[in-house]
Amino acid sequence: MIAWFYKYGFVLLLLNTILYSIPETNTIAPTIFYFLMGIGLILLIINPSQIKDVIFHRSFLFLLLISLVNLVYFLFFESEFNQDSLEFLMARFVQFSLISLSIYHNYDYYKKKFSSLIIKVISIIVVLGLFVDPDLLSGRYYGIIWNPNMLASLSVLAFSFVLMKNEKRTNLDVLLLILFFIVSIATGSRLALLIITVSFIYKFGLSIRNVFYAIIGFILLFLISSIDLNTSFNRFSSQDILNDRTDQFNFAVNNLEKKFWFGYGLSEYSGLPSNVDVPEEYQGLLIASHNGYLSIFLQYGIIFGFFIILIIMRKSLMLSSYFIRKEQKDNIFLFIVIITLIASMFETLLTGINEFHTILFWFSLSYLSYSKYLQDYED
């Protein structure tokens, strides 16, 4: 049982984030989350010598370093004892530990079968959504997920997993690509449109095929934007892509200036600190920062936030350079890292505990780090 949890604990943690996103299951998701955290913490305590070899493995030292930054911040720079901050500290450490243990003990599974699992699970979510709500054109589509942006995140990631497959595409793969594309566009997420565009460039480069796809895309953009819908094409063409982020960005910067050096605390990772006063003109609006980097600075302040972002960027750039030199650019996990760093300029990624895309980013970075270690060892 312990060995099984080491191998698949991360998978359970990742899939549970989807339960958080479905209104009918979001009441049981916290129970599952705390159960997984409790089991993980107990195993860390009762097997310190065995787990130490994994946590201190050179591939996962960057995760340990982030956990140490969290610990130092919590002990010396939290304005007052905060149970929510303590829970964040422990949850992040256990989450990182489960990621490290799963990769270390089950690397071949994540190399060969994990992508297939992601595609199957998200396919089920999308198909169930179409049964419950088949009308893709009446407003922003969200299926069985509580938020259209969350559905867009799932569907566009599944689209990327299918697109990046190295095996010859089957008819089912083509059908899934079309399905995930249509659902992603129907959500009205402009970020989904950006990720799809980047995924084609990443996979095929600036080839004649991509030029052809771009022409088709512009034709679709023109045709669909002339119809009164609320798809990603319509929202992209009718608005400046940054226009509804300007107020959010400025408000976040104003909040950061109030606690510039040490931020609002570990528990404030949403991009909107809970104790700030929202101006009357923003009442009723979603005024979180919608920027992962700003959210880190709001959480930690400039000093500790700089260290966190430096660790992320250094590791990401080092791994990107390595795998591109090795001509392994089509690695799906490398794409997840790159696109998350880009998407974090428009969404609050990188900081959350129970957010699918964020956890997948930390896993991808860790997987690539361990993969690099194995390849270096073979060489």
Enumerate the language-model features and the residues they cover:
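A membrane-periplasm/extracellular boundary helix in multi-pass inner-membrane enzymes
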Residues: 186-187, 204-240, 253-257, 266
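Alpha-helical transmembrane segments of multi-pass inner-membrane proteins
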Residues: 102-105, 109-137, 146-206
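Long extracytoplasmic/lumenal interhelical loops at the membrane interface
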Residues: 142, 238-250, 254-300
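N-terminal signal-anchor transmembrane segment
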Residues: 1-47, 65-79, 92, 129-133, ...
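Transmembrane alpha-helices of multi-pass inner-membrane enzymes
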Residues: 38-41, 333-379
